[in-house]
Amino acid sequence: DASVHQLSVAAVSDALPAMSARAGPLAVDLPVYSKRNPFVASILENIAIVGRGSTKDTRHIEFSLSGSGLTYTPGDALGIGASNDPAIVAELLSLLSVARDAVIDVKGQALTMDEALTHRFEVTAATPRFLDYWTLLSDAAELKQLQQDDRAGERTIFLKTHHILDIVRRYPVGAVLPTGFVTGLRPLQPRLYSIASSLAAVPDEAHVTIAPVRYALHGKSRSGVASGHLADRAELDASLPVYIQTNPHFGLPGDDVPIIMIGAGTGVAPFRAFLQEREARGAKGKSWLFFGERHFRTDFLYQTEWQAWLKDETLSRMDVAFSRDGAEKIYVQHRMKERTRDLFAWLEEGAHVYVCGDAAQLAPDVHAALIDIVAAEARSSPDAAEDYVRALQADHRYQRDVY
């Protein structure tokens, strides 16, 4: 999913049947719950935070951590164990002619196929392992040809453009053994979301900001596994397994240190946490937020909160870029270049820079803008400006949480 990190934590799935059981005695300084023993958190709030007419369905979701003993700091992430769409599982079992109550062994535990495909295995994205398995069962010449060494590029494209359901539907086979089918699947992995809250402001809660991944493939609407679950099926009071993933490389400096925060879309989530924390602590350090989205009217995430922080000076400055509101697309890096002199002055004062969001576009564009700003204001060569920015990274004054 977009706006998420993925973890290879099969152990979360292993813990699902006993999620509500506490672990044995632990050292005093360790939480009771972890990624191997996730806490079952109830959903306190799940609301859309975009306006009517938005092309997105960005949501603010609040989880209760009450009784968990879990703690986090701004910059950390929440690992969430989502489940597959029941409609996809039902269609897959129908195509396979496998009974939903057929029982299989999964790491020593007896599960029905419905349980296993819903909670334990990835049934959306096709992998090379699944393609290998299905090709062995199928008589389809097209699949056999894709396995040839000189077709590696085509095979990669095929896997990117075909889900497991697409392959099963397009290349039907005879009888499928339930135990054999799951050997071609990978474990369902939890997803990581930047925490959008501070315990200093909302004790025993963790908030996240999620934009569900939605797209069309082969004429059918598709959704991301976790983001689709959270947006479409996670109702109030529902419970999901969660854990805290610490992020020591993306955290606030001292209270008096200036901070520059740059994010687009859901990448603004940790900066909400930063400002909640600074407000609660009465921090005096200056703060500057650059925020980008598509439309001012519909997509200004957490608008009233930023305005309140500007009013009480928890947030010193804010620049916004709404890319689809004008004749030309304007992004956060363009706003940065409009504030070249002030940005460089903040850097010279010791400001820390934080970037959160898309790794493919936002991160490199902001990085290039920083180098251009330093080169222009310091009247230095591009190489010298790059050295300056590299020094910021080495001093942990330029931190990125990108995905």
Feature annotation, model-predicted:
Residues 1-403:
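FNR-like FAD-binding dehydrogenase module
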